[in-house]
Regions:
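Hydrophobic h-region of N-terminal signal peptides that target proteins for export
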Residues: 10-18
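Right-handed parallel beta-helix/beta-solenoid
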Residues: 18-46, 63, 450-451
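The right-handed parallel beta-helix/beta-solenoid scaffold, focusing on the short coil/turn
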Residues: 20, 55, 71, 77-79, ...
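N-terminal extracellular ligand-recognition/capping segment immediately after the signal peptide
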Residues: 45-48, 53-91
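Short glycine/acidic-rich loop motifs that flank beta-strands on beta-rich extracellular proteins
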Residues: 68-70, 91, 105-106, 111-115, ...
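Right-handed parallel beta-helix/beta-spiral solenoid domain characteristic of secreted/periplasmic
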Residues: 79-162, 166-174
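Right-handed parallel beta-helix
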Residues: 83, 130-145, 160-174, 192-208, ...
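Acidic, glycine- and Ser/Thr-rich low-complexity intrinsically disordered tracts
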Residues: 90-108, 168, 316-451
Length: 451
């Protein structure tokens, strides 16, 4: 027994010795330093190159641009990254000592191969890691100055930008390049790592693509106490890459359980925009997918263009979810949309009681509408909110007034002309400082103040 205990202790000691703390300070560091508190590295990309599985990287305040200002970071090792330190690492306050990833449009030509600002990709490793415990905490992602926005179209009074533009369209007056159109956090679909991936106390703002787009093979994904504000298509999306054993189409084998458990708790998800400025599809605050067991609890999910929570991806028998204790408000079409074959049901929070046991929903309790709008006073950008609530989309035909169309009209034939579309706003840049005010807006619900 004593020999076994000794061997166990030695193994634990070896594991501890292998895990290192690496310190990075953009202002005071140098890439030739050792990466200690006293001699930090200068750049995160350098720390990621030096790191080994199990290491923790500590980031001081600053705007980290990536190697050659590419503004993406390859995370191909099972590391943790903690931000929010003062430049001398004397204290850690993420909303005071901001560790930021805030690219500039002028560098979009350097964006390289990274699909996300953080691209988690283990596929080049000889063996992908098992049993990881990767933690990302106190980080701020903002693509508001990497995007390109129209100079005048879709620009409400008092806004500093017009509507978001998808490349190749761009604002040639202000910008050098089209929008970067990348994820903020991306995990490769071919990843086969197992274990736990956590993002806590982070902010995801102004993404021109899905903000948090993570595929995991087996284990846990945790997203807790984060703010998602003004992102395009989906705020948070988690998928499972492990194949599901089936006894028939959409019939998992008896005893099967989802391989990925996703905890999405105490997050605030506001202003998720549609794919295009016609406001026709996407615009989901949160989406669950096949092979995932999602726990959606105590979040504030509101002001999303299509729906707060999308449950239409994959058959209900192939996924599970509990949706409890959330605040849903002013999502434009519905608070939840789900598959009720062969249709899509769009349901408001006051109709949730009928959903339990449907489409993989195991529990849906204690959800409510926003009781006190005053909770967002001085925390939400009032101009942005008012413009969003007043937003209109119109489509009209400017007809040819010639005799040809006159005759077509008499005969009941289709008229010919040009279609013009107009939307009051679309994914305009949201001020980062206002997005960060959303931490702590409602006690117990949504993102809480970071301690």
């Amino acid at each position: 027994m004593n020999k076994l205990m000794t061997l166990t202790a030695l193994a634990l000691a070896a594991t501890t010795a292998q895990a290192a703390d690496i310190y990075v300070s953009l202002e005071t560091g140098k890439n030739k330093n050792e990466g200690t508190k006293e001699a930090p590295l200068k750049n995160l990309w350098k720390a990621l190159e030096n790191a080994k599985d199990g290491d923790t990287i500590h980031l001081a305040e600053g705007i980290y641009p990536g190697k050659m200002k590419q503004n993406w970071f390859l995370i191909d090792k099972a590391v943790s990254i903690l931000g929010g330190y003062s430049k001398d690492f004397a204290e850690r306050k993420p909303l005071e000592h901001k560790t930021m990833f805030q690219a500039l449009n002028e560098n979009n030509d350097k964006k390289g191969a990274g699909l996300g600002v953080f691209t988690i990709d283990f596929t080049k490793q000889a063996k992908q890691p098992d049993g990881v415990d990767m933690k990302f905490d106190g980080l701020i992602f903002d693509e508001g100055f990497a995007n390109s926005y129209h100079e005048t179209k879709g620009k409400p009074e008092g806004f500093d930008t017009g509507m978001w533009l998808e490349g190749p369209a761009m604002n040639k007056t202000r910008d050098k390049f089209p929008s970067a159109n990348r994820y903020l956090v991306y995990s490769a679909t071919a990843n086969r790592a197992t274990g736990k991936l956590s993002f806590t106390n982070c902010a995801f703002v102004n993404s021109g693509n899905i903000a948090f787009n993570v595929t995991w093979y087996q284990g846990d994904v945790v997203v807790e106490n984060c703010v998602f504000c003004n992102n395009r298509m989906i705020g948070a999306n988690v998928m499972c890459s492990k194949a599901i054993p089936q006894d028939g189409p959409n019939k998992p084998r008896a005893g099967w359980k989802p391989e990925v458990n996703w905890l999405f708790k105490n997050n605030t998800v506001l202003f998720t925009w549609s794919r295009l400025n016609d406001l026709a599809d996407m615009g989901f605050g949160v989406r669950n997918n096949t092979g995932v067991n999602a726990t959606i609890a105590d979040n504030v999910i509101g002001l999303n263009v299509l729906t707060g929570y999308d449950n239409t991806k994959g058959a209900g028998a192939m996924k599970k979810q509990s949706i409890d204790g959330n605040v849903f408000f002013l999502n434009r079409e519905s608070d939840i949309q789900m598959t009720v074959s062969p249709s899509i049901a769009k349901v408001r929070v006051d109709g949730f009681e009928d959903l339990e046991g449907t489409d993989g929903i195991e529990s849906i309790e204690d959800n409510e509408d926003l009781k006190d709008p005053a909770a967002f006073k001085d925390r939400i950008n009032a101009k942005y909110l008012n413009s969003f609530l007043s937003m209109k989309y119109s489509e009209s035909t400017k007809l040819d007034e010639g005799k040809c169309n006159g005759l077509r009209s008499v005969l009941g034939l289709p008229l010919q002309g040009t279609i013009t579309t107009q939307c009051d706003m679309f994914c305009n840049r949201y001020p980062l400082e206002d997005a960060l005010k959303l931490f702590g807006a409602i006690s117990g619900k949504g993102a809480q103040a970071i301690k």
